[in-house]
Every structure is written in C-alpha cells, then in structure tokens.
Amino acid sequence: MENQHQKFISRRNFIKTSALLGGTAFLGTGLPNIKKTYSKELDYVGNFEYPLAKPENILYSACLQCTVACSIKVKINNGVCMKIDGNPYSAMNLGENLPYDLSPKEAVSIDGKLCPKGQAGIQHAYDPYRLRKVIKRDGPRGSGKWKTIPYDQAIDEIVNGGNIFKDIGENQNVEGLKDIFVLKDPKVAKAMADDVTKIRKKEMTVDEFKAKHKDNLDVLIDPNHPDLGPKNNQFLFQVGRIHNGRIEFTKRFVNDSFGSVNWIEKTTLCGQTSNKAWVHSTREYLEGKWTGGIKSPRPDHRNTEFLLVFGSIVFEANYGPVQETEPITEGLESGRLKIAVVDPRLTKVASKAWKWVPIKPGNDAAFALGMIRWIIENERYDTKFLQNATRLAATNSDEPSYSNATYLVKVEKDGRAAKHLRANEIGIGTEKEFVVISNGKPAAVDPENSNLAIQGELFVDTNLEGIKVKSPLQLIKEEAYSKELAEWAELSGAKQKDIEDISKEFTSHGKKAAVEFYRGAIKHTNGWYNGQALIVLNHLIGNMNWQGGISNTGGGWSYIGDKEGQPYPMANLHPNKLSKFGVPITKEGWKYEESTLFEGYPAKRPWYPFSGNVAQETWPSISDGYPYKIKAALISSHSPMYSLPGGHVQLKTLLDTEKVPLLIASDIVIGDSSQYVDYIFPDLTYLERWATPGQSHHIRVKVNQVRQPVIAPLTENATVFGEEVPISLEALMMSISEKVGLSGFGKDAFGPGKDLNRMEDFYLKLVANIASGNKQGELVKAADSEEMELFKSSHRHLPKTVYDIEKWQQTLTSDEWKRVVYVLNRGGRFASSDDAYEGSFIKKKIPGLARLYLEEIADSRNSISGNYFTGYPKYLPIMDMAENLINDEGEFHLITNKEVFGTQSRTITNYWAQLALQPENFVVLNSVDAKKLKVDNGDKVLVTSTSNPKGEHLIAADESRPTIGKVKIVEGIRPGVVAISTHYGHWGYGARDIQIDGEVVKGEEVRGLGIHPNPLFRLDDNLRGTTLSDPIGGSASYYDTRVNIQRV
C-alpha cells in the first residue's frame, strides 16, 4: 500500500493547482519528500542527539481523529510534525499521570498512550488534497468544476449576494447574509423572545403579540406564527465533530451575533439517545422542577468486578480505546473482572468475555426486561437503596445517592401511567412534593429536604383519594412480568439460561457491577426504551457513585468563566448580544402542542422536545420548507451525504438552488458533501487550531486538555479586522461579522478596550479561566523565566499569523499570561489520577437521583401518531414515526461498526493506519450464511434493501454507483446478520477527479475503495426520504434494516 501510494504521489504533476496543498512548494513532489526529511534527521548513529527528545521540539495539544480528543504530545523538527504520542501529564493518556508541577524539560522523555488514528494524524494535516484557497463552483452544484477566487471577493459575494453566478449562465438573484440579518436591535429581540416564551406557555395570544410589536413585525418569518422567530433563523450553521471552545466561538457568531437559533450539531448520528436517556435518568428535583442530569455516566472500569456490555465496542471505539483498554485488560489479567457481552458481532472485547450473547439487533430491551424479571423474582435488587426516597435517608444508610423507585405515579382510566402524584392532590402537602407509601401510609416527600429521611414501599398498586396510583418499580415489574422469561429470551434471540446466568452474576458483586451500552443498543427506533431498560438495571443494584459501579466523569476546571473569581465570564462579555428565539429547523427542544403550528395529529414532520442536534431532520425539513425555508447554510466538519442514513436521498435538496439559495462550506478538503456547495472556504486541521475539548467519559479526575496550534497553518492568509490570519472557520465568521456589522467581534467585542480581532483573543481567555480554577486557591503556578524561554523556543517555528507573542500577551493581564503559559507548556490542566475516590465512593458524584420513572416523557406525545410516550422501560418492535410496524422482507439484518483505525470521513487520508491496515471494508457474513449464498472470501456481492431495491448510491445528479462489496466470512457474527463497517466507500476527499481553474486534479482510487452502508438503510415511508428515527431520543436508526445479498 505504501509503495502504491508513493508511486501515485511521486509524479511531479499529479496536482498542478496551488488551491490544494499537493500543488504547493511545501510538499514539492509529494509526501515522500517529507519522509526523506524524516530519514535525514533521524538516521544518524553514534553520539547524535535525538531531536524529538528535546523539550523545545515538543508541543502539547489535543487530538481530533475521533470524538475522545486525547491529550497529545506533538514532536516537531524544522517546523514539521514528525511524531504524535499521548500526553503523559494527562490521566486520559497515562494511567498514573505525571505530576502537574513536573518541568516539561523533565517530562520530555516520557510518552503517553495513543491509538493508531491519533498517531496517523500527521497525514490528516499533510494530506495533498487539503484545500488552501477559497474555491467557488464553476458549473452547476455537484459538477466537480471549481475556480479559485480571492478571499475578500468570496466574503463580499456571500454577504451581499446578488446575481453571483451569472458568469456560469445562472440568472438567480441570491440573498446575501446581510439580507437575512434583519432583526438587529437587541432590545427588540429580547422583548420578542420574552413574549414568544409567553405564547409557548399560553400566557399570550398571537394577536396580543402582534399588537404589542406592530412596528417590528416585518422582521419575523411569519407574523401569524411569531414563534418561528425572525428571518435571521433562515441562516443555518450545521456542524459535525466540534469541541468545547470552538462550540462557544461558533455559537457566539450564530446565536448571539447573527441571532439565528439554527446552530445544529450531528449528535443524533452519534450517541444522542444514550446521552439524553442518562440525563433524564439522573436529574435532580429542585424548586419543583427536574433539572440537570449527567449525559454519559460510565462504569468505573478500574474497580468493576462484573461488566455487562451491550452494543459498545469498547476496545475499538466508544470513549475510547485508549482509556478503556488498559483497566479492562488489567482486570481480566488479574482475575478481578469478569465480562459478558451482548452484541450480534464478536467484538474485540467479546473475544475476551466470559459470555458472548449474539442477540438479535434491536431487541436489547427484551434481554434487559428478562434480566429485570429474574432479578425481581429472585429479590436480587438493592432494597435499601431503592427504598431511600430522600437524600438524608440515603446518607443515613451510607448511600451516596437515592432513587424515585417509590414515588407514586398516577394511572389514568385507560391504564396509562402519567405524572407523579403530588402531595397537594391528596391533601397532605404541596404541589412541589411527591408521595410515597411509608409504614403503610402516604407521606409527602421533598427529595432535597435536608431534615427529611423517608423510605418508601417498593411495590405499590392502590387508590388514594380516588386516584389510581402505582410505584415506578411496580410498573416496571408489570412490564417485565408481561412475558415469561422464555418469551423474553426468544424475542432477544438469546438462551434463557444465558439471561439467568448473567442476571445472577450481575447481582453477585454488590455495587461493583455495571452495565455499559452505546450505539448498538440505542440506534434503533426503540432505542430510548432499550437504553432506559439498561439504565434501570444499573439502578436496581444501586451502583451509582460507588467504586466499581456507574460514575460521573472527573470533569474539569471551567473554561467559560462561570465560576466565582474567574477572570473571563464569556457569556457576559458580549455587548449588544442578540436574543435568539424561535423553533429550530429541526423542531428540537419544542413540543408540537406548544407551538402555533399545532393543528392536531399528525404534524407535518416530527418534533423532538427531548432531543437536540437532530442532524437527520435538517435536510428533509429544508426540502419540505417546514417549519420555514432556509435561505443560506454554512456546513463545517460535517458530511450529511456520507454520515446520514439515506443521505444520498437528500442530495437533490443540496443540488436545488431554490431549496437552499446560498450553500457554503468550511472544509479542509473537497469532501463527500462539500463538493455540492457554492463556495468552500478552507479550514485548519486540529494541529493548526484551538479548542478546549474536555475529557473522556471514562476518566474520574479533572482533565482540561487544550488544543493549540502546533504546526504552521497550511491555508492562505487573509486580512480580518486589520490582522493577517490564516483562512479558517473562525476567520470566515469574523470576516462576515466585519462586513455585516455584527456585534461580538472586532473592536470592543468583549467590552470597552477589549477587542476580538484574532481567534487567540477569544481562546486565550478560555485558557486563562482554566488556569484560574473553579474556586479561590486553585490558581496554577505562574511560569518562571525558564518556562517562559521554553515556551518561546517551542513556538519558534510558528508564523505571526498564529503566534504573535506580543499580541497574545496584550489580550491578557501580565499575571494571567504567565499562568496561561504554564498551562500551554503542559497542553492543559490535569489532576492526579490519585484524586478519583473518596473511600468507597467516586469523588465527583452524579448529583441527581437514580430515576426509574420519567414523568416528563410520560406526559408527552409522539407528534406524528399523537400517542403518549411511556415513562418507564418497555419493549417495542421496530416502527416508523407513525408507529407502523417495520416488517420488511430481506434475508439478512444489516448492522454497522467502526474499526479502531477508522473514523467516518477523515481517516481515509491515513496511509499509515486505515489504508495500510485495511484498504477496504467488507460485507461480513457468518459461514452458515455464506454457504447458503454460495459465496467465498473476496467474492463481490450486491447488497439491496427495501429503501434501495436496486442497490444504487446516488453521488451526482446523473451518476450513481452500485452498493457492491467483497465478502468476508467469519464465525463471530450471528447467522442472519451482516455487518458493513463505516469510513470506506468515499467519493470525495480526493477519491474522484475534479477540475480547478481548468486543470484536472486526478483522484486517488484507493480513497474510494469499499462499500458504504448508509445508502442501504431503511427510510421512513411517511417522511419523504428521512431515515427511521427514535422519536424520543432523536437518534437516527443504523440497525433496523433488512437486506438481500446477491453474488455478482
């Protein structure tokens, strides 16, 4: 593979255009020249002093080859990134991390752990297909024809609009961003936002709103529906992988400066249902409201004795292999840990397990409810924990948390469990108090009353003052008992004995057992209830906040300045900030019934009150113009055509200039989706930019890694607010702000005398907050003269466009600057791995309750079917949004997965990892199925589905390719299930020929090898090309498709 790649890129003229990195002097005739530089520098012998072991050649940063954002140690020579390892200061990458006060000069010889993707990040940065200049389409959208244009011209065109494509024969007057930025007055925006909230709560009518705001109704999308918000909302920013820091920078632009609600991330393509189910299942009850919650509790792997894994490939993906592999392996090696894995595919961790149960995809709740039945029948639940109804009761019984297992639930006449009973409803307390049965009588419960220690009865089915009530555990018992254990086993595809054995083992380790789950369990239409059932298993043994149980992350020091004494409260440092308001294009965070669009059921499209960042709903909603039209969209680090199930169906929307008149991308390459836009502005890779990502879910101590530029930027420069800076997403947003006149950027952006002219003016303030700590007495040390000199020498290769030390110092006080240097010299701020525990408990606890019943879910409806959701775990078959059963013909059930060396799009450039280890993916079958199909390893097969009966993947207006892949036969997959991994089968990213300024840039065939499974996934027949989705958590379905396979 390496020789093939060298042969390709050694041709001097393979990329002639300077718009791409491979056509510049930096790479010369290609990447082998960099390799020669490596060899020239490192092949010395004798007394040669190894340059990569010198502290002045080391910079610390944060990875972005996957979501985990490992802390990294970047080794540089002559300005070139030569090697990437883990940062030994960080507990993310070294189990017993180095003392934070250890000098970087002493730390230089110690490396932390890093996965193959992280080490291959060099090729992400130095990809010859990287975009350096702004390009504009030179033909119809998706034609593959481009031309370079000056940065300032591109900014002028997207801001001012007009007939900007007349040179290619298009006669369309495009509204520029300045024409969409209509609501400009912060006072008007605030008043309107407040009143839309009143409309939402039914405290104000639309007529009253219109009368009050009669002088400004022209700024609204539709004055008859003020809750759609201002015309500003017709600007969409959709982003994929983005981390803290950059999140706040872009939200500052989209939400606070431009005033659009449409900042949409890609989370429902990832683990959103898991996140939201955990958040609601760990909330606190404060001042009469459920609030807070933790989105991603995980097992304390270092102390767990029994780990039950559902649909999570912990050695290959999740959050992430670097953090999970070591404690799990140590536990297996020492005999401390026993593992069971419930997954249709034999994952790496399943190969080490005591039991592997190849479940039927989508039937995780059936297996979990079988376990719950066995646990209740055999009384193996933690009675003491579940009975504790208040925090004081938990404290008195030496428990760090408590549950709502005993909080009575009202049962409607039709048998539907609704909201919790409140004490005022039966005359024993207030509307903010719950009711339990304690000592045979109803008792009012305020969960946080520090003087109240109450224990409730677990199984209750009674009437109080004429109101039918049941306890949450009673409702769960009834669901679990609705089928015999043998029936649950049959539904799940497991053996009854496996359910019994695993249930017994799970309840044999006290608090030191845990259920871990992720995408495999929740990326289904029934994903919410699957996830909730697995969460309840953890709650039944009361393992929350215990060593070896389910625990919170260690968190970090606040980067946004919301702690007392921190120098930069970023939310308050934005004069003339606009108040965003209105329904997002995805209808997320809103109940259909509270909007003025409510006209009974079904709604025109789904609404997602309990989810956010519903990526798969974005483009179908744009296509339908519901709830309104989008006039301009900016896409960054996101590839909807590649990452969305059925994304190819939405290609027609991207290509339609009537649907989205102005389509812009900020991208490092001409990608699988950015190839269809009007303008592409080059962006920086993670080795050239800033962020403050936050830590992995699996670390129990504070971690604040800081992403900072470690190599010179490889994009062209531009002048923004009088400063020469590299073209990037930040520069693009700042240039738009400068041209349109938005608040929050440029002169006095943070307040009088506090400018935001360069991205460092923003990001260094975040680092200063981290250095300050969360409370008094937590300041990091100030860098001494030796550390200051090291800082200067290690940054010596960076140009002033990204490292102007005088301007860096000017954006902070002298004292803040020295402490920021101390943090940057270590790549962030890190607590010792010894700081994770307090006795038998996790030190940083989940503050809320273990909630077995979610009344807010039970009190809400599916916007399409009109039926109520359920507040406790239940078994549901696979259904569309209208609750029609999906019972497709198709011989095989399709699932997907990741390899440890691959991540969606960006790792296709990694010749050292993905392409060297496995240049293409496979259609993975069990040998039983291969015999039926009469296929062998390497045979090509066509894969088809109900939603794609011809097996065609549309990649252009008039071009498609077949969904054909090579067979790989394994024993480690359930018969009847077929697996196709992601991160292959590209048609952008340098995989095909394109044309720039009349020159053909040849694609590299190896980048397009393999089969992409997403075009095969089942679509919702009622929603015009939208994938099946979970109506509560909002996740797109990746595991509910049946396919047929035919040898070709």
From Swiss-Prot:
<keyword id="KW-0479">Metal-binding</keyword>
<dbReference type="InterPro" id="IPR006656">
    <property type="entry name" value="Mopterin_OxRdtase"/>
</dbReference>
<dbReference type="GO" id="GO:0016491">
    <property type="term" value="F:oxidoreductase activity"/>
</dbReference>
<feature type="binding site">
    <location>
        <position position="63"/>
    </location>
    <ligand>
        <name>[4Fe-4S] cluster</name>
    </ligand>
</feature>
<comment type="subunit">
    <text>The complex is composed of three subunits: SrdA, SrdB and SrdC.</text>
</comment>
<dbReference type="InterPro" id="IPR006963">
    <property type="entry name" value="Mopterin_OxRdtase_4Fe-4S_dom"/>
</dbReference>
<dbReference type="GO" id="GO:0051539">
    <property type="term" value="F:4 iron, 4 sulfur cluster binding"/>
</dbReference>
<dbReference type="GO" id="GO:0046872">
    <property type="term" value="F:metal ion binding"/>
</dbReference>
<comment type="function">
    <text>Component of the respiratory selenate reductase complex, which catalyzes the reduction of selenate to selenite. SrdA is probably the catalytic subunit that reduces selenate.</text>
</comment>
<dbReference type="InterPro" id="IPR019546">
    <property type="entry name" value="TAT_signal_bac_arc"/>
</dbReference>
<dbReference type="Pfam" id="PF04879">
    <property type="entry name" value="Molybdop_Fe4S4"/>
</dbReference>
<dbReference type="Pfam" id="PF01568">
    <property type="entry name" value="Molydop_binding"/>
</dbReference>
<keyword id="KW-0408">Iron</keyword>
<dbReference type="GO" id="GO:0005576">
    <property type="term" value="C:extracellular region"/>
</dbReference>
<protein>
    <recommendedName>
        <fullName>Selenate reductase subunit A</fullName>
        <ecNumber>1.97.1.14</ecNumber>
    </recommendedName>
</protein>
<keyword id="KW-0411">Iron-sulfur</keyword>
<dbReference type="InterPro" id="IPR050612">
    <property type="entry name" value="Prok_Mopterin_Oxidored"/>
</dbReference>
<feature type="binding site">
    <location>
        <position position="70"/>
    </location>
    <ligand>
        <name>[4Fe-4S] cluster</name>
    </ligand>
</feature>
<keyword id="KW-0004">4Fe-4S</keyword>
<feature type="binding site">
    <location>
        <position position="66"/>
    </location>
    <ligand>
        <name>[4Fe-4S] cluster</name>
    </ligand>
</feature>
<dbReference type="InterPro" id="IPR006311">
    <property type="entry name" value="TAT_signal"/>
</dbReference>
<dbReference type="GO" id="GO:0043546">
    <property type="term" value="F:molybdopterin cofactor binding"/>
</dbReference>
<comment type="similarity">
    <text>Belongs to the prokaryotic molybdopterin-containing oxidoreductase family.</text>
</comment>
<keyword id="KW-0964">Secreted</keyword>
<dbReference type="InterPro" id="IPR009010">
    <property type="entry name" value="Asp_de-COase-like_dom_sf"/>
</dbReference>
<keyword id="KW-0500">Molybdenum</keyword>
<feature type="signal peptide" description="Tat-type signal">
    <location>
        <begin position="1"/>
        <end position="39"/>
    </location>
</feature>
<keyword id="KW-0732">Signal</keyword>
<dbReference type="InterPro" id="IPR006657">
    <property type="entry name" value="MoPterin_dinucl-bd_dom"/>
</dbReference>
<keyword id="KW-0560">Oxidoreductase</keyword>
<feature type="binding site">
    <location>
        <position position="270"/>
    </location>
    <ligand>
        <name>Mo-bis(molybdopterin guanine dinucleotide)</name>
    </ligand>
</feature>
<dbReference type="Pfam" id="PF00384">
    <property type="entry name" value="Molybdopterin"/>
</dbReference>
<feature type="domain" description="4Fe-4S Mo/W bis-MGD-type">
    <location>
        <begin position="56"/>
        <end position="129"/>
    </location>
</feature>
<feature type="binding site">
    <location>
        <position position="115"/>
    </location>
    <ligand>
        <name>[4Fe-4S] cluster</name>
    </ligand>
</feature>
